Amino acid sequence: MHEPCGGCGELLDVTNLGPFETAICPICSTETHVKREFGAYRLDQRYAIGGMSVIFVGWDTTLDRKVAIKVLNEEYCNDEIRIQAFENEGRLTAQVSHPNVVKIYALGRAYGRFYLVMELLEGLSFERIMAQRGALPEDEVLDIAIQVAAG
């Protein structure tokens, strides 16, 4: 697979590079980020890193909407057990329809990498809120507990 250099247009071999890895052009030394397209989805920025995957903020080029794209780490892309767990996560979550459960839009594979496309939830995590604010008032904690119990 080849992508053009952002500086001079030279075609760079990016076959073995993962999402957002950098290729350096041998002609002009420009750094080019590669593999931003996963089918109909474009990876725009890293959002979170987990034990088995990286989540990107992306764009659904077909439906013109922001999405979250979870990409299985490259080291697990030949591990059938991890692939199955990743795919099961997507399939099982897609069967749940609840306001407190993220919606799954697609499950796919591109460039040998497995990915899930899901609803992008924006805002602060509970962990971040606690780090910023410390102990929360009882009424807020109860509201959060009710939401957790419902979902």
For each predicted feature, which ranges?
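Protein kinase glycine-rich loop
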Residues: 44-51, 55
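Glycine-rich ATP phosphate-binding loop
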Residues: 57, 65-74
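Flexible N-lobe loop architecture of eukaryotic-like protein kinase catalytic domains
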Residues: 48, 88, 97-100, 113
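Activation-segment/catalytic-loop signature of the eukaryotic protein kinase fold
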Residues: 107
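Conserved short submotifs of the Hanks-type protein kinase catalytic core
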Residues: 111-125, 129
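Non-catalytic scaffold residues of the protein kinase domain
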Residues: 52, 98-101, 126
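Activation segment signature within eukaryotic-like protein kinase domains
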Residues: 144-145
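AlphaC helix of the eukaryotic protein kinase fold
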Residues: 73-95
